[in-house]
Curated annotation (Swiss-Prot):
One of its GO terms (biological process) is translation. The lineage of its organism: Bacteria, Bacillati, Mycoplasmatota, Mycoplasmoidales, Mycoplasmoidaceae. One of its GO terms (cellular component) is ribonucleoprotein complex. The keyword Acetylation does not apply. It comes from the Bacteria. It comes from Malacoplasma penetrans (strain HF-2) (Mycoplasma penetrans). It holds the Pfam family KOW. The keyword Lyase does not apply. NCBIfam families: rplX_bact. This is Large ribosomal subunit protein uL24. One of two assembly initiator proteins, it binds directly to the 5'-end of the 23S rRNA, where it nucleates assembly of the 50S subunit.
Length: 107
């Protein structure tokens, strides 16, 4: 079970983007990276083609390593938290915040 999932709100804890917050758009488990909205944005030059008549410079969010991301717990006043696992009433495995000890909503 992946600790961080698509739709989670995260904060960058190290690197040049430290302190920035965003929502995970896409997770790449085999590369241990995640693409976060508005974080680690790079400029890419796009060539003109049939679909896009105009070429130009486009901003693209580049994936960050998961070790640089921490989950934000809304119930703990926006603090970052670690994740542990437990079972709900239906014996389904769920993610639980270590700070507020509450279940993290599945997306």
């Amino acid at each position: 079970m992946q600790r961080l999932k698509k739709g989670d709100k995260v904060r960058v804890i190290s690197g040049s983007e430290k302190g920035k917050e965003g929502i995970i758009l896409q997770v790449f488990p085999e590369l241990n990276t995640a693409q976060v909205e508005g974080v680690n944005v790079r400029k890419r030059h796009k060539k003109a083609n049939q679909e896009n008549q105009e070429g130009g410079i486009v901003d693209i969010a580049v994936p960050l390593n998961m070790s640089k991301l921490a989950l934000i717990d809304n119930k703990a006043k926006g603090k970052t938290t670690r994740i542990k696992y437990g079972f709900d009433k239906n014996n389904k495995k769920v993610r639980i915040s270590k700070i507020s000890n509450s279940e993290i909503g599945s997306k």
